[in-house]
Structure formats: structure tokens, C-alpha cells
Amino acid sequence: GNAVSNIIDKTALSHPEIAFTYIKDGKQVLRTFGDGKLISAIYSVFGKDFAKGLIPVDYQLDAIKVYGYISKPEHSRPNRNMQNFFINGRYIKTRTAMVALEEAFKGSIMVGKFPSCVLNIELPCEIIDVNVHPSKLEVRFINERPVFDAIYHAVKSSLMKYDSRKKASFKKETAFNEVQNKFNPFNNAPAILNKPVVQSSKNDFVQKQYAK
């Protein structure tokens, strides 16, 4: 059931280069294209709306590389269900990554809301111990600080880029509206619109002549 779907979803996300088809009770539940693009796998697993609300992340700090996607601040959620971390290609639950992600989003989203992500973290094997949890779902970092820093800065820099792009497009829109208003003849002569086009004393005289 759900546990199987969950495993297939996570495997598909960690291997966008492999095409997956999952059929349950004769119905196709999941199909990924295997085109090597993470965004394609996300689209297949989580759907179009989720995929459209994402910002790309691509960052390296020393020996640690962080890449994937985070949700736009306006697409935050009421829970952490859509936080997906992969360390060296394996789906992992890690408090360090979760805290780093949420700290980077502080001030960008409302309190009580949570960011979503599909983030790959590549790091040297010697700084992790995967044998903490029987299912190997949790990891312990020999040194948490560099991992926290890499994820925090990766997310923060992507959010800042997104924010500056949003501000730039808002400025562009505002500037365009100002230019339009400047060159709109009706804006400069609003009185014309409120009065009849032809009105003069001569006209009154003509009307009076015909009225006789």
C-alpha cells in the first residue's frame, strides 16, 4: 500500500535518470520518464502544481554540494510532509538538514508554516554514520556544522535570488504602468470625459431658433 508507494516515490526522486512505472491493482499509479531531470521526476511524483511552485538550488560549500528544489515562500505548507532530503543518493531523515532549511526560510514564511523541498546533499562518506537507525533512514554527522552551513547557505542564496527577481519584475511592471499613464491622453484631460463633446452659446441660439 502506502509504504510501497512511498519507497517507489523516494527511489524515483533519487534516480531521475531511471524510468519507473508503478502499477497497483491494474492501475498505473506512477510513471517517470527517466530523462535525468529532477524536476521531471518531481512533476511525476508530486504533480504539476507542486512542481510549478519550486525554486532551483545549486550550491557548493567546500566538499559539500547541495542541489535540487525548494518551495517558493508563498507555497509553504501546514506540515513537514513534503520535506525530502537525499544524502549521497539515499533518502534520509535528518534533523540537521530540517533545521537548516527552516532557519533559512525564517522571515520569509509565516510562523507555523513549513517549506517543502527535494534536496540532494553530496558529501564525503567519512563525515556521516548511517548505521544509527536500523532501517538506515537516519544519519549522524561526525561534524554537523559544515553540513548545516552548506544547506542553510544553499537555501538562503536561492531565496535571495528569487526575491530579487520578484522585486525586479514588480519594478518593471510598476515602471510600465507609469509610462502607460504618462502617455495616455485621457489621463491628462479627465474633464473631457465628463462633459458633452459639443456645447456652446451658438448652439443654444440655433436650438432656440428651431424651437420657435
Feature locations, PLM:
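N-terminal phosphate-binding caps/lids of nucleotide- and nucleic-acid-binding domains
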Residues: G1-K212
